[in-house]
Amino acid sequence: MRAYTSLVGHILGSHPEIDGYYEMHRSYMLADDLDRQLGQYAAHDALKPGSRLLFDKLLHNDYTLNLALPELADATLLLALRPPAATLPSIVALFAQKDRDDLYATPEGATAYYVDRLAALAGFAARHPGRFHYFDADALLADTPRLFAALERWLMLETPLAADYRRFSQTGVAGAG
């Protein structure tokens, strides 16, 4: 949610152990959803030889995650937030670009959206303590080496992350988040 997730996704997706870099707009409620995610990703981008992680972003409350699935038992979840002073104008600007009038294109609508998202994330965190790693999104720009070290540790990467990243088939495509 306006927390540099496109940049994070591209940095992670450029790593040889990680496939995926964009928002796939899906929930993960059944094991079949994970297979569909893999198929959806592979339809646009080749899977890397030796990759072991598949990345997605769940940026909105519309998408749910069933952590009771055995297939997600060892999933690594990352939560990132950006302060409201930067996030709210970004939400307004994003939704003001849409072709239709959008509630989130106003400061009031953006604030309601942000508060709802925070409440959903707080609820998720309360229900799943110890199942996620949190970082301040601004650390990506303000303290990149420390954040990269934490991400490498959390994801158990064998090689370091790099600030340079690839352009992929869905880079810059509207709706790919």
Predicted regions and their residues:
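The conserved 3'-phosphoadenosine-5'-phosphosulfate
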Residues: 126-177
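Conserved phosphate-donor/acceptor-positioning beta-strand/loop module used by diverse small-molecule
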Residues: 73-93
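Glycine-rich phosphate-binding loop used to anchor ATP phosphates in small-molecule kinases
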Residues: 47-67
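PAPS-dependent sulfotransferase catalytic core
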Residues: 1-52
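Short catalytic/ligand-binding loop motif for oxyanion handling, primarily in non-cytosolic enzymes
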Residues: 4-9, 28-30, 63-65, 86-90, ...
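Lumenal/extracellular "mature" regions of secretory-pathway glycan-modifying transferases
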Residues: 23-31, 35-36, 97-113
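Soluble or luminal CAZymes and related metallo-dependent hydrolases
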Residues: 36-37, 59-60, 109-117, 143
